[in-house]
């Protein structure tokens, strides 16, 4: 790891020191008009040890993106990490960490009872063939089983 500070926040995180699963505040940006954008690192898999398979990850993304908005109007985006170990959860004007944990908890519980993956068709999705509701539900179940660990980022 370089001693030089990098522009991308996660590139400055020592991935060998973290212990998934966890939720950490990765950054705050303030807009020109005072809005605060909070980006959270929702890490599901241990970096460089495990990763989510794409169909499960893809379905979990669709499910969380849709279902989280039933619990808050502050959600801007839920986006998967390219390394397939987690998601970035981005909210506007919402700085209550415990409430973010509750939001993720409620959303994952919604995933467990979902009957289908939202927007899982060629009109609404760029890779509609790559989905697994069962895989997404298994990820949600495993993550919820470790709910008491989410606030512990480092080993």
UniProtKB/Swiss-Prot annotation:
Question: Mind listing the GO biological process terms from this record?
Answer: quorum sensing
Pfam families in the record: LuxS (PF02664)
Q: Does the keyword Iron apply?
A: yes
**Superkingdom of origin:** Bacteria
The cofactor named in the record is:
Fe cation
From the UniProt record, list the reaction(s) this protein catalyses. Answer: S-(5-deoxy-D-ribos-5-yl)-L-homocysteine = (S)-4,5-dihydroxypentane-2,3-dione + L-homocysteine
Q: Which family does it belong to?
A: Belongs to the LuxS family.
Q: What does this protein do?
A: Involved in the synthesis of autoinducer 2 (AI-2) which is secreted by bacteria and is used to communicate both the cell density and the metabolic potential of the environment. The regulation of gene expression in response to changes in cell density is called quorum sensing. Catalyzes the transformation of S-ribosylhomocysteine (RHC) to homocysteine (HC) and 4,5-dihydroxy-2,3-pentadione (DPD).
Q: Mind telling me what this protein is named?
A: S-ribosylhomocysteine lyase
Source organism (scientific name): Chromohalobacter salexigens (strain ATCC BAA-138 / DSM 3043 / CIP 106854 / NCIMB 13768 / 1H11)
The gene for this chain is luxS
């Amino acid at each position: 790891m370089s001693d030089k500070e990098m522009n991308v926040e996660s590139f400055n995180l020592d991935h060998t020191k973290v212990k998934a699963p966890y939720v950490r505040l990765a950054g705050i940006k303030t807009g020109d008009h005072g809005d605060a954008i909070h980006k959270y690192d929702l890490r599901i898999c241990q970096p460089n040890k495990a990763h989510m398979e794409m169909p499960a990850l893809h379905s979990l993304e669709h499910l969380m993106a849709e279902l989280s908005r039933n619990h808050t109007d502050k959600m801007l985006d839920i986006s998967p990490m390219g390394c397939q170990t987690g998601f970035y959860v981005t909210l506007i004007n919402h700085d209550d960490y415990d409430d973010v944990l509750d939001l993720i908890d409620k959303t994952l519980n919604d995933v467990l009872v979902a009957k289908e993956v939202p927007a899982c068709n060629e009109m609404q999705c760029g890779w509609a063939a790559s989905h697994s509701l069962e895989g997404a539900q298994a990820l949600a179940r495993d993550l919820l089983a470790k709910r008491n660990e989410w606030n512990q980022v480092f080993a």
